[in-house]
Each structure stands twice: as C-alpha cells, then as structure tokens.
Amino acid sequence: MKSEIVIHEPATGGERVVYVTDVLIEAPNWSPDGTFLVFNGDGLIWRLDLADSAKPQRIDTGFATACNNDHGISPDGTTLVISDKSETGQSCIYTLPIDGGVPRRITDNVPSWWHGWSPDGRTMAYAAARDDGMDIYTVRSSGGEETRLTDGGGHYDGPDYTPDGKWIWFNSDRGGTMQLWRVRTDGSGIEQMTNDDRVNWFPHPSPDGTAVLYLAYEAGTEGHPRDRDVELRLVNPEGGGIRTAVSLFGGQGSINVPCWAPDSTAFAYVRYARP
C-alpha cells in the first residue's frame, strides 16, 4: 500500500508531500519545535526530520514493538507517549524519552488508547474500554488512578485538549450518530459541537485556538475504517463555520492524533493510494 505524509496549509490550500512509502504508515504528530514528525508503521515508531525527510529514523521503543496509531509528543518536546499491546495483549499507554528508551507504563487498566496531552503537560486524555463501554478518561502524565469523564450510553473516542486547557473535544454517538462534542476537564458541561449528516471523528483543536480539525466520513459509515473517500474539515472553536480543508482517500490512520504544526499554519496527514 502506498502511503504519503502530506503537509497542508489551511490559509492558502497549499500542500507538499514530505514522505512516500509502500509501507502502511499512520498518524503523524508534529514536534513542538516544528522540526520533525513522528508516525507509526509496522508496529514501530518513526521520526521524520523535515530538513531531511527522505530517511525516517526508528525511535527505539524497547519491548514495545506492537504500537498502534495512538501516540504523541509532550508539550515540552522531551517525552514520547505510545499505545502498545506487546506486554498485555491489549493496548496500553506508555511514555519514554523522545529519543528512545525503556517504556514506562502509565495506565494500569487495558485496553487504553492515548489521544491528547494537556497544554501544561500534567495530564493525558485517552479512550478506554471498560466493563460498561468505551469512554473518555484522564490520568496524570506520571501515571496513577484514572478519572472517567463521560458516563457511558454510547461510544466515546478521540479526546484532545483545547490550548487553554479548559476543554476536551471528542467524538461520540451518544446522540445517535458519531458527532463532535466537548467536555470540561472536570467532566462537566458536555456540549455537542457538530450536528450534520456526516460521521465525524478525531477532533484536534489548533494550538492558536482558532479552529478544530477533524475527520468526516460519508453518512452511514460504520466505525472509522481506512481506504474511504473522506474529508478533513475545520470547525470554529465555539461550533459552526464548518468548511472542508482536504478531500482524500484515507480515514483510519490519516489524523488519529494531534497533527497541527506548533504555529497553527499547517497540519500533517496521511493519505493512501487507491487499490
């Protein structure tokens, strides 16, 4: 499968392809200093320096060699977070130095899929399947007891923080179809932010707080499959003003985790070649 990492500038519509491979790769994160991307492929985590994007370098994740596409970088740029099933057989969240090292387990319970880091670096947000369904949780970045923010009654996924740290955006079908919602970081004030005929996943507030990027599937799509005609859309931070930034062949793996450039002028995504 041909995979391409693309950088898109919403203000101009300009794009550039920074990496092409015949391996299935997913979910680019942008480093806080803007110099490199991190992505996953073949169960491993890779670093792509934007000054020399022809040769990505593997980040040593120790025993964790079954990483999925739910990974990211701490706000200070020193720490990598991964979701991996090597140890438990189910997705579990770990942290390690950004240049590689021994993973340190963060979540006691499984399965857990990382999605967002608070702007102050103290807390992580993630989706987790427990006995009563899939919900949004937070945990201290150093580990410890998890806090459940949502109350069941549907599927909850894709949590990511606003840059002021006051809200967490996520997607849920609690209203019937998969739409975007937000909740305060203490679990109060849940609000629906989109309400249309698309199937909407993985919201990512921009670092400057002016827009939220998300993945929009065609009406009636079940789950979040790959290899579909999809759109990357933008919505205003208080809702409304929805516009399409990119139409592509992709879906799962395109923007599962935070992908904005630190200056909010661009975002990175993955698209795939049609079979």
Write out the residue ranges for each language-model feature.
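Conserved beta-propeller blade repeats
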Residues: 22-37, 65-80, 109-127, 153-171, ...
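Loop/turn-rich, solvent-exposed surfaces of beta-rich toroidal or solenoidal domains
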Residues: 176, 197-233
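Beta-propeller domains
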Residues: 40-53
